[in-house]
């Protein structure tokens, strides 16, 4: 469920641009791509039309995504949220009981400061933190050197400080960007590639925590 209402990217990254149909119960039927049920504001707007809404409209949309979509039986409902502690986060927490939040950061302090605010917000609304993921941890240069553009270990250190699991690093891979642009995620295109394994390891850790 894509709750980045102002900047939805799920349609592009999952390679699907259709509009959802309406069921006999007057609920939207989520679209499916690569075996995943999806709902996004990007399915409801033409092209690159912007969403220019105040908070109450955003809140109602998120409520509709939860209550007026025929999700059926799910293993896990994964919600993509924008950065920060704004209306999207608060609306979601007020609409549905959450098993927990996964915090995504980059290694540098500028990002970690925002992360601490996010953790504090979830704590205030009684949503447990399932773990921290460090994105864009490093890239491997053509000569094989590991280059840490944004510093090293910030996510792991913050997880230790917060007393929450560190779920892993996602390095910078060209394949991740290419998969997102083409609508074929790297975990679908080549399941045994290093970038796919980075995501698979993260998913397995999260599944062990939840199930």
Language model: regions and residue ranges:
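C-terminal lobe/tail of nucleotide-utilizing enzymes
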Residues: 119-211
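Glycine-rich phosphate-binding loops of nucleotide-dependent enzymes
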Residues: 39, 62, 81, 94, ...
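Phosphate-binding/switch loop-helix module in NTP-utilizing enzymes
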Residues: 44-92
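Conserved Switch II/interswitch segment of TRAFAC-class P-loop GTPases
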Residues: 72-79, 85-86, 97-118
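Phosphate-binding loop that captures ATP/GTP phosphates
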Residues: 1-48, 53, 59, 66
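Hydrophobic residues in beta-strands of the RecA-like P-loop NTPase core, especially within AAA+ ATPase
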Residues: 1, 78-79, 133
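Conserved beta-strand segments of the P-loop GTPase G domain that flank and frequently precede/overlap
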Residues: 40, 103-106, 132-133
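Conserved nucleotide-binding/hydrolysis micro-motifs of P-loop NTPases
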Residues: 5-7, 44-48, 83-84, 107-111, ...
């Amino acid at each position: 469920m894509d709750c980045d209402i102002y900047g939805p990217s799920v349609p592009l990254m999952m390679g699907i641009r259709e509009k959802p149909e309406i069921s006999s119960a007057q609920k939207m039927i989520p679209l499916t791509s690569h075996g995943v049920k999806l709902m996004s504001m990007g399915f409801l707007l033409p092209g690159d039309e912007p969403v220019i809404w105040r908070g109450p409209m955003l809140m109602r949309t998120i409520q509709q995504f939860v209550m007026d979509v025929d999700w059926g039986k799910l293993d896990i409902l994964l919600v993509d949220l924008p950065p920060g502690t704004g209306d999207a986060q608060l609306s979601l927490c007020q609409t549905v009981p959450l098993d927990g939040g996964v915090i995504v950061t980059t290694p540098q302090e500028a990002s970690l400061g925002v992360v601490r605010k996010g953790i504090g917000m979830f704590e205030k609304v009684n949503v447990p933190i399932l773990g921290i993921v460090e994105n864009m941890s490093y890239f491997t240069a053509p000569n094989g050197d590991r280059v840490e553009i944004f510093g090293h270990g910030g996510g792991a250190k913050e997880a230790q400080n917060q007393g929450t699991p560190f779920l892993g690093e996602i390095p910078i891979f060209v394949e991740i960007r290419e998969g997102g642009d083409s609508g074929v995620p790297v975990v679908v295109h080549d399941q045994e590639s290093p970038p796919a394994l980075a995501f698979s390891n993260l998913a397995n850790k999260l599944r062990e925590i939840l199930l």
